[in-house]
Curated annotation (Swiss-Prot):
InterPro entries: ABC_transptr_periplasmic_BD (IPR002491), Bact_iron-sidero_bind (IPR051313), FatB (IPR033870). Belongs to the bacterial solute-binding protein 8 family. The keyword Cytoplasm does not apply. Keywords: Cell membrane, Ion transport, Iron, Iron transport, Lipoprotein, Membrane, Palmitate, Signal, Transport. It is found in: Cell membrane; Membrane raft. Disruption phenotype: Disruption mutants are unable to use petrobactin for iron delivery and growth. This is Petrobactin-binding protein YclQ. PANTHER family: IRON III DICITRATE-BINDING PERIPLASMIC PROTEIN, PETROBACTIN-BINDING PROTEIN YCLQ. It is a lipid-anchor. GO terms for cellular component: membrane raft; outer membrane-bounded periplasmic space; plasma membrane. A lipid is attached at C20 (S-diacylglycerol cysteine). It holds the Pfam family Peripla_BP_2. Residues 1-19 form the signal peptide.
Length: 317
């Protein structure tokens, strides 16, 4: 009888321990299972599964970086390429943010070492998408220049959904829409045309509607001095004589050399016998845009705000 009682107690104890163990395992599994959303983007039309509110993010797109910063999410940034950071993002030079290579040459080993929950890339890293995806869920958030505002807003809203910041994004986009309406009114009132050029080591590229910098025409309402510029990412190669012949009322200048830390060539482009007599130069309407923001960044909540202001201030000079 005594042996039977001891055996019964042992069996009951084993059942209780087993039940507690299963409950503990179940609770742990529940805690570690994260909510996910599916993000459709240019490099994965079926969608990439992304964890909600990721704690560590590696960002290769400066526009997305400034959106995260604008939304108060700078603390989740684990790493970024620091080589040519635009001035307005200089806070991210701090050592608490890891340097993960350059925009064109990522340090995949460093990215993997950080063990991120999410990686955000854009056009300059698109060819490395598969390599990034082996490390962590990777999404492409670059703007489509042919549909600039649509893609810009979509990118911001995507970040809002991932981080539960949808209301904040909505407010920021409303402010941007208001600022765009203001710059368009200014452009319409002036009724002048403009030409966007990029100087690169003495060479010149022009950008028209639907091109990389076409938002100056398509979104901000500045009439193009030349309607026939071929839309492309790198612009249409042009000469000093072309600028003279086109004779724009406003000349918007981006200096690639300055943006990437090399020698500026804007004076060579603007201050020469061919260009000095165009309307824009004679009337003091040459607008030198912040090259790092326009060439390296753009498409973020903060960069878009700055770009609108630059164009509006330039038109009101």
């Amino acid at each position: 009888m005594k042996k039977f009682a001891l055996l019964f107690i042992a069996l009951v104890t084993a059942v209780v321990i087993s039940a507690c163990g299963n409950q503990s395992t179940s609770s742990k599994g529940s805690d570690t299972k994260k909510e996910q959303i599916t993000v459709k983007h240019q490099l994965d039309k079926n969608g990439t599964k992304v964890p909600k509110n990721p704690k560590k993010v590696v960002v290769f797109d400066f526009g997305s970086l400034d959106t995260l910063d604008k939304l108060g999410l700078d603390d989740i940034v684990a790493g970024l390429p620091k080589q040519v950071l635009p001035k307005y993002l200089s806070k991210f030079k701090d050592d608490k943010y890891a340097d993960v290579g350059s925009l064109k040459e990522p340090d995949f080993d460093k990215v993997a070492e950080l063990d991120p929950d999410l990686i955000i890339i854009s056009a300059r890293q698109s060819e490395s998408y598969k390599e990034f995806s082996k490390i962590a869920p990777t999404i492409y958030l670059g703007v489509d220049t042919a549909k600039y505002m649509e893609s810009f807003k979509s990118d911001a809203e995507t970040i809002g959904k991932i981080f539960d910041k949808e209301d904040k994004v909505k407010d920021e986009l409303a402010n941007i829409d208001h600022s765009i309406a203001d710059v368009k009114k200014t452009a319409e009132k002036l009724n002048k045309n403009g030409l966007v050029i990029m100087a690169n080591d003495g060479k010149i590229s022009a950008f028209g509607p639907k091109s990389r910098y076409g938002l100056i025409h398509d979104v901000f309402g500045v009439a193009p001095a030349d309607q026939n510029i071929k839309a492309s990412t790198h612009g249409q190669s042009v000469s000093y004589e072309y600028i003279s012949k086109t004779n724009p009322d406003y000349l918007f200048v981006i200096d690639r050399g300055t943006a990437i830390g090399e020698t500026s060539s804007t004076k060579q482009v603007v201050e020469n016998d061919y260009v000095k007599n165009v309307n824009a130069v004679k009337n003091g309407h040459v607008i030198y845009l912040d090259s790092a923001t326009w060439y390296l960044s753009g498409g973020g909540l903060e960069s878009m705000t700055q770009m609108i202001k630059e164009v509006k201030d330039g038109l009101e000079k």
